[in-house]
Amino acid sequence: MVRIAGVNVPDRKHAVVALMSIYGIGKSRARSICLNTGIDEHVQLCKLSEIHIDKLRDAVDEYIVEGDLRREVTLNIKRLIDLGTYRGLRHRRNLPVRGQRTRTNARTCKGPRKSMNKQFK
């Protein structure tokens, strides 16, 4: 296991796939990191020298990833809630934020159905 940005990255996988295991790095960002550092996307991390791995570490450190990114997202949501915006209200009520319909669907956001338990007898 190679440690990059505080994460144990699997070294038996290709460089792009291994970098994608870091929170905040997707496929396109992983490819651009490999391109900028001059590392082939399809080489396994265990076959790279320590110099190349250090280059990867330095390239990943330029981005906001892992705990810092999670904290930033949480603070952004908290800021919306504190400001009392519509989006903050939707976050506080655990409803869809981006204008999706809620009359049907939205089960993931709303949680399991609340049954009506013979209220209308």
Curated annotation (Swiss-Prot):
Listed Gene3D superfamilies: 1.10.8.50, 30s ribosomal protein s13, domain 2
Molecular-function GO terms, alphabetical: rRNA binding; structural constituent of ribosome; tRNA binding
HAMAP family linked: Ribosomal_uS13
Alphabetized UniProt keyword annotations: Ribonucleoprotein, Ribosomal protein, RNA-binding, rRNA-binding, tRNA-binding
SUPFAM superfamilies: S13-like H2TH domain (SSF46946)
Pfam family, one: Ribosomal_S13
Protein name: Small ribosomal subunit protein uS13
Family: Belongs to the universal ribosomal protein uS13 family.
Gene Ontology CC: one annotated term: cytosol
GO biological process: translation
Stretch list, region Disordered: 93-121
Keyword rRNA-binding in annotation: yes
SUBUNIT field: Part of the 30S ribosomal subunit. Forms a loose heterodimer with protein S19. Forms two bridges to the 50S subunit in the 70S ribosome.
